[in-house]
Amino acid sequence: MSITVAIDCMGGDHGPHVTVPSAVEYLRHDRDTNIILVGRPEILTKELNALNISPDSRLRLYPASEIVGMDEHPAIALRNKKDSSMRVALNLVKNGEAQACISAGNTGALLATSRFVLKTIPGIDRPALAVVLPTISGHTYVLDLGANVNCTAEHLFQFGVMGATLVSSVENKPNPSIGLLNIGEEDIKGNDVVKQAAGLFRSSGLNFYGNIEGDDIYRGTTNVVVCDGFVGNVALKTSEGLAQMLASYLREEFRRSLFSKLAGLVALPVINAFRRRVDHRQYNGASLLGLRGTVIKSHGSADSFAFRCAIKRAVDEIRGGTLRRIVEHIETLRYNIEQNITQPASVE
């Protein structure tokens, strides 16, 4: 199955210096994928020349004259920059020339422009950002990570459906478990929105584990963790800060004395193995679910390895039929609700 993805090459902290080499390297390992590099041709050509690479049938350039700044207001970018590399890449998906768009650019602008250009799937009110986080038992998918600060119970339910479908399609895991992030496991805990969302999950036939707490995320208690964008973003940023603090503490302790430096040398293989397990770069690429097209948001500061992981995430979603399966599952759930059918609606 041949796949074509469009890359917003001008977005992110490093722009073409990372996106272009990442695309070239990715194509060396995936012969069934084609990439469209979107941006200013003269800049993209310069990057390709530095790599001794010329555009061909698998790697082609598509011109876009404007760039969305990382601190630019989403509404201004949407209204005034119709030829930005971000918007042109999304238009390629809309027009069927590409099956996915990948951008490391301004998150707010990407959310607004994606929703405007691609529109949402019927039955989905709002798109949600889903990210993979490492756990004791492997990894889990968390959504929403910031696309929606204020959510209704129905929104949270839709996030759960999309997250479960993502897991089942990308990882071939039938009927993945769903947990609702709360301040306690008991049914009486949480605000009205969370309580109502729990009721929707219980009556849906989905594999709903129940309420989970923050520490359950990294225990891997469930395959999918559902929360609103405010809670999800705070949880993610808190985790990133904790990881940085622990890394700083370790560096300080191993440099404290000659003995600790020697201990650090002895422990180096273990430390390197630990780093590989928790390396956030391998999880780069947040999926913007709920749109009529595949959109992946890379971290703005991603290096080449991390950006290649974002490309792979897009390709995996396309190969797994994630978008098609979300549409089908939402339609099934809507039909069951309309017909008052109560049999299980498991995600396959």
UniProtKB/Swiss-Prot annotation:
| Protein EC | 2.3.1.274
What does the UniProt keyword field contain?
Cytoplasm, Lipid biosynthesis, Lipid metabolism, Phospholipid biosynthesis, Phospholipid metabolism, Transferase
EC class of this enzyme?
transferase
Q: Which domain of life is it from?
A: Bacteria
Look up keyword Magnesium and say if it applies.
Answer: no
Question: Is Lipid biosynthesis one of the keywords UniProt gives this record?
Answer: yes
Please give the pathway this protein is involved in: Lipid metabolism; phospholipid metabolism
Subunit organization: Homodimer. Probably interacts with PlsY.
Record Pfam families? FA_synthesis
Catalytic activity as recorded in UniProt:
a fatty acyl-[ACP] + phosphate = an acyl phosphate + holo-[ACP]
Instruction: Specify the protein name.
Output: Phosphate acyltransferase
Relate the protein's function as given in its record.
Catalyzes the reversible formation of acyl-phosphate (acyl-PO(4)) from acyl-[acyl-carrier-protein] (acyl-ACP). This enzyme utilizes acyl-ACP as fatty acyl donor, but not acyl-CoA.
What is the similarity comment for this entry? Answer: Belongs to the PlsX family.
**What's a single GO BP term from this record?**
phospholipid biosynthetic process
Task: State a GO cellular component annotated for this protein.
Answer: cytoplasm
Lineage, please? Bacteria, Pseudomonadati, Pseudomonadota, Betaproteobacteria, Nitrosomonadales
Q: Which InterPro entries match?
A: FA_synthesis, Phospholipid_synth_PlsX-like
What are the GO MF terms of this UniProt record? phosphate:acyl-[acyl carrier protein] acyltransferase activity
Protein location = Cytoplasm
